[in-house]
């Protein structure tokens, strides 16, 4: 008879699948340990404990290895695991979290006993004594010393990791991150003490060792160390002694072999500096040479081993300099450089996985906290603490950041540091890189090791992904708020609760540290923005922290903030404006860059604000590039044609031109356009305005019979003719007319002249927009000649009287507006003059060379620097353009492709025809592009035409950024400009034969 067991009598042992074991041999391994045969509660509890290990399969594999080692005492360990819940929690969590500690246990199988019972970590002093005793006990056994020290250090890490991880498996106390980090620093101190003892014995023998103090820096100095980290140190000596460097070097060698890498690169002069300096030498260096980052590093300095009294003297001497660092002349520039360097360190392909250097990562928190300490600890000693968590608490308590923000930032920081610890424990390797999000197994392991559990909607891996997103976003937002929110509160409405720390003086210091040269003025602008009545003030209070942060990265935050205030006041009634900045961060960030770089574009945006809405990206890319210059030109001409009144027509044309200039300038500043595209777009809009003005003036000036007495064409000269206008270029033109049938030349010229004069006057009317000046001085006889000539008059003049400079000027002549057929006939007529069948005469070439030499000596403005004048300076625009034009005059009769008004296109032809070596042509091209970018950038930055690059300083930095230089280092930009133009000048001299 078959007896069916009751459900309560069925085997209690969970299956391999229920335990989460996925390795195919998992069942065999359980059988090998004998854990699959006993159905008592102890074995059930044991198996469920194993299942909770972060990686149960890894833990099981390590247990098999332990069981196979005869030195383990497996029977004792097995019995203990069945009886002792705390041992299970510690051992299984370690084996499931750390392959490296599993290897350590297998190599030292008796070390599992360190995890039994009531585990108490030794104190700092006990730990140091035990490591030093290990050294003393090993005297006479030098071969085993490093091994014994490494084993002792790993045993301590094993104990600490077991206590840290146990709560992931059993209901054990959670060890706070700050305690773990401090205990790791204690171990590092003890390890350094042991290494120093070994080094002193090795170098000094029986003689007294030199007085050395070892100063821990970085995370070790702040007692917030990682499981795996380089330990940064600085060595200080009482006096010069040849043994100092030998002891220090030996100490680093021993420590690196037994424990961890020891790095002394934070010492004065870095790796190029002396390894050991006297205290006096340290003081002299920090007084004269130290950079801001070196003072920032000293925030974490802590004497750890060696001569304690000397270490304290080191701190006493140097820390006052740290608290005065924000007063240094280069403080702001160096802080800005440090902020950018942090962002540029991370390769783009792993930026989203970087715990330390990625956006919203650990370095964001640490940098923000340290900068606030440097700014405010000068006057508040409560901020003079080393650890990031302690500093956040002190900043919150002192009112320098909101208390809730301090608590949230601390929570995010500790969460990210916890993940960093878990990642490093796995193989005891230094890493800050999260697993690939697609690696489900690795993400699940990390989640379990960090004690993250399913939440009902997501499994542990899903919860970790969501938590990481949340924490990164929170850190990014808080990173901005830490700097700016307390500033806004300090200037907010009366009665707002502000802690005592954030006085107006402290607020000014913080703004100065963030790059504002006029912090008190900046505070006034901020106050005006946030203290508006109603919704606008509230929205500005929410927006400003992030906007101010973005603006602080621009070359001129002060000018940017003023421009933002003016723009906000001008658009106060436009509801879309603040809504766009609030809802579209990309638009807001780009706008802050533009406002903080340019004086030219903000003025345009105030009267063409809808361009701001084009700062976002569309499906095909940036909306600023969706507009075609040709379409703008057609719309502008059509718009003007709707008005019979010339003034209203030109006002309409100005409106569209203003919008187009704002679009071009914005796209240029944001790096969306090449310089040649900028020049073509600027030329296109100028030509459209000219065509619109000519059309409307002709319509308004028709006689009663509505028949124009003459056809009129406008010939573009100079950069207008070459379609290479810059923001500050003149528009050089000539007017040509042809009488209508039955109209004599005199009447046609008189009528056409009145049209030309009225067009010039109408366009030249003073306006808040960039000027629309027409320059007709390149016409025959210059200012003394008639403004308008007939085609026949031009032909007669050029045939009889054309001077070499006039022939040269005609090389850029191009029909740009008016009667197209007349314009083309004019060009065919002047082709005989500018491209004569036999080339220009040798006398003409000599005359052009003479004129160029005279221009170089006479036309450069008084006081201008010939090396940095973009137009007339060495290797500048005039040099390149005159060189191209000389080659056109000499060779255009043989090379038809040189019948071209564009400098860049003509350079291509010169290279293709091998008139000048290709390498030399490339030097000319780069100089023209560099000078054109610089000249355009000067107008964008200063808001008015200018050709002279400024000297070193904020304005040159802004020009560098506006010109598309890779950073805001004006010095680098200027060096490149000088190098490029110097090389081009050598080519110019070769071509001109001088």
UniProtKB/Swiss-Prot annotation:
It catalyses: [glutamine synthetase]-O(4)-(5'-adenylyl)-L-tyrosine + phosphate = [glutamine synthetase]-L-tyrosine + ADP; [glutamine synthetase]-L-tyrosine + ATP = [glutamine synthetase]-O(4)-(5'-adenylyl)-L-tyrosine + diphosphate. One of its GO terms (cellular component) is cytosol. Signal peptide: none annotated. Gene3D superfamilies: Beta Polymerase, domain 2, Nucleotidyltransferases domain 2. GO terms for molecular function: [glutamate-ammonia-ligase] adenylyltransferase activity; [glutamine synthetase]-adenylyl-L-tyrosine phosphorylase activity; ATP binding; magnesium ion binding. Involved in the regulation of glutamine synthetase GlnA, a key enzyme in the process to assimilate ammonia. When cellular nitrogen levels are high, the C-terminal adenylyl transferase (AT) inactivates GlnA by covalent transfer of an adenylyl group from ATP to specific tyrosine residue of GlnA, thus reducing its activity. Conversely, when nitrogen levels are low, the N-terminal adenylyl removase (AR) activates GlnA by removing the adenylyl group by phosphorolysis, increasing its activity. PANTHER family: BIFUNCTIONAL GLUTAMINE SYNTHETASE ADENYLYLTRANSFERASE_ADENYLYL-REMOVING ENZYME (PTHR30621:SF0), GLUTAMINE SYNTHETASE ADENYLYLTRANSFERASE (PTHR30621). This is Bifunctional glutamine synthetase adenylyltransferase/adenylyl-removing enzyme. It comes from Mycobacterium tuberculosis (strain CDC 1551 / Oshkosh).
